[in-house]
Amino acid sequence: MRSYLTPVAGLTCLFALAATGCSSMSDGTSDAAPKASESSTSYAPYVSATTATGTDSAGSPATYNLAFVISGGSDCTPRWDGMFGMDDAEVKSRIGKLRKSGATVRVSFGGASGKELATTCGNASALADAYGKALDAAGSTQADFDIEGRTLADSASVDLRSRAIARLQKQRPGLEVSFTLPVMPSGLDSHGLALLESANVHDVQVSTVNLMTMNYAESYTGDMGDYALTAAKAAHTQLKKVFGLSNAAAWEGMALTSMIGANDIAGETFTLEDAAQVRSFAEEKRIAWVSMWSTFRDRQCEKGVPSRADAATDCSGVKQKPGAFAREFGG
């Protein structure tokens, strides 16, 4: 998933599931506290670490994925969006406001833009320290690693990251780790599977594998909701094999993240109907959480539905009311 600052662009079991089956800008949307729900599927949108929007609280998120922490250049210093220090007062204030509803905050490292810290830190100890600084700054015990593009294909950084996360979990018992990975309707690719295997080799305790059901390819011109479900089913089979999980546990260790409205690939548009479809499926399968990229885009563009194919960073590109996607995902 893209940075908010990017210009518009054309054999360890799942830790949380070990007991259940492991075999080896305001736009007028008001704040709302998380609502009680019998569903095991929570709503956890991606939000900007630096900029608030009136749609942040729509859908009553249980958790906010705070995006993104990356390197500020070529060193091992973690920065919000690659620009702001961990002690930035405005970011700290923002985190505090997000928590007022009772929601938790998950720190998301990586993303599609900038340099993920595993590509700039020299060793596992330094990398673990960098990750830890970000978690401490946010007061969080939840870490998400959004690994994609060239970074996902970089086996050296994949190995280093796994070793650093394992080290960090030993230092911080109870640290929840999720991996956010690109997926196709056919499932995770070889690089995504290799990352999960690396996590296994280094005894990383993985809570959730979050699938980015978005931006497939120009040949995928069908229904984006259907594609999301197809991708989830394919990845479900893969997760069972990688982690040695039961059917139920593999679903419960999965999350789904959609790019709302116009995607970066021309012809791919994720609609409100698709969001409702994904939410229903997630509840049926007891998937851990659903998410979207992003709250900042959960509004109609000022000029309505643009004719251009590019996805905007600050609106969805489809006809909607502010926060409409969040309300669908929130259930």
Write out the residue ranges for each language-model feature.
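Bacterial N-terminal signal peptides that target proteins for export
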Residues: 1-9
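Hydrophobic helical h-region of N-terminal Sec-dependent signal peptides
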Residues: 10-15
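C-terminal motif of bacterial Sec signal peptides marking the signal peptidase cleavage site
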Residues: 17-21
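Chitinase-like catalytic core of GlcNAc-active glycosidases
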Residues: 23-211, 215-242, 251-255, 261-275, ...
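Feature marks hydrolase-like catalytic cores characterized by long aromatic- and Gly/Pro-rich stretches
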Residues: 31-33, 283-289, 327-331
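Conserved active-site loop/cleft motifs that coordinate metal ions or position small ligands
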Residues: 255-258, 289-294
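Short, low-complexity, polybasic intrinsically disordered segments
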Residues: 268-289
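A short, acidic, flexible beta-alpha connecting loop/helix-capping segment that sits on the rim
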Residues: 295-299
